Amino acid sequence: MLVREEAIRFVESMKPTDHVIFFYDTIESKCRILFSFLDNGLASRKGAAYVCSEESLEQIRNRMESYGIDVNETEKEGKLIIRNYDGWYIENGEVEYVKILAGWRDIYDKFQKGGLGLRGAGEMACFFKHNKVKELLRYEYALHRVLDIPMEAICAYNVNTIVETGYTDIMMPLVRAHGWAIFTGPGGEMIYQSENVEDYDIERLLQVKV
């Protein structure tokens, strides 16, 4: 079992093309990991992009402010982009993974013009709530375990949402679509290379049946 600081150190040290899946069971855990990841990037000549779907834009902005990120000023400086899932992941009820990938490339290119890299974080709850799980898997596998875009990315999954919508069976396929996996749950916190994760690791750490 890892101490909390190790997960923070891991996300802060992520490198371009790293593609990480992050399972959490509380909002506090989500914010602690994702905001540490983005804030460290902002301090290291990287832009930050965040896609909301579990919480609203206003909620995320307020949580970032509470964490210590000056949202308004960072947006004015052109270093922070916060988007809602509607129009990004799902548009007019459809998921077009090619369009999503192009969107990430556009943001990367925009930041590159300002001499910045890119750290991106996305809440993935919308795919479960809108029954777009097959499309989600296509998107995650299209990103590849090692990203084609030289950005660092964390795809964030609330375990409670997965359980409530009855999709625990896709947790392992989702893990395999990424290079690394972070688990924070009732059984503790762990970081794995995705090929080393077994069903019993997920069940022990998150206390779910896969």
Describe each region flagged by the PLM.
Residues 1-210:
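Non-catalytic regulatory/interaction regions at protein termini and inter-domain linkers
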